[in-house]
């Protein structure tokens, strides 16, 4: 089926952990299953709403992080007034009923806002430290550590073609969308 899993030793249950086709192979030949790392980042970092790892044939992993605008405001990293406008666009893009024209306009505004937040060094450092904390501490091997992050406010959604109808990230589409912008 292409699914990856493990047996829970305590119960004997099969736990699905990811898909074989999602495997990232670094330039040093190490194979990395991104799902457990992505799950750790989203659960440990309040600022990150969604994440996808990239790094195929590269030297290290890069996390494409969709940030939560409300969490940014609560952390004092973004003005609450600006966040109100961003949240309207964020919710519009996440609405599967959003018409194509409105969704494209909302995505464009979110991309512009994303370009602005990338110049906020304090915000970037806080996101990087949160991602590094989530992937360090012995839970993951050395080559599974995320070395760089790319932040955006545009969510992975059905309306912008980055999520399937079953809410799975379309990894190829996300990688193509950000290939020119990733370090």
Positions of PLM-derived features:
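Short Cys/His-based metal-binding microdomains
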Residues: 161
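AMP-binding/adenylate-forming catalytic core of the ANL superfamily
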Residues: 2-140, 144, 155-158
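A short N-terminal helical cap/helix-turn-helix that marks the beginning
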Residues: 135, 139, 178-183
């Amino acid at each position: 089926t292409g699914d990856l899993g493990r047996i829970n030793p305590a119960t004997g249950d099969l736990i699905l952990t990811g898909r074989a086709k999602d495997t990232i192979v670094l330039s040093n030949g190490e194979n990395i299953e991104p799902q457990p790392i992505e799950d750790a980042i989203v659960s440990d970092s309040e600022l990150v709403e969604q994440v996808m790892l990239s790094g195929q044939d590269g030297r290290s992993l890069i996390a494409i992080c969709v940030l939560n605008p409300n969490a940014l405001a609560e952390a004092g990293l973004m003005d609450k007034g600006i966040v109100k406008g961003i949240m309207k666009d964020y919710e519009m893009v996440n609405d599967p009923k959003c018409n194509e024209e409105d969704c494209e306009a909302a995505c464009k505004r979110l991309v512009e806002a994303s370009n602005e937040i990338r110049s906020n060094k304090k915000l970037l450092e806080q996101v990087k430290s949160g991602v590094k904390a989530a992937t360090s501490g012995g839970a993951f091997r050395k080559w599974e550590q995320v070395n760089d992050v790319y932040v955006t406010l545009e969510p992975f959604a059905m309306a912008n073609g980055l999520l399937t109808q079953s809410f799975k990230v379309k990894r190829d589409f996300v990688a193509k969308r950000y290939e020119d912008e990733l370090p």
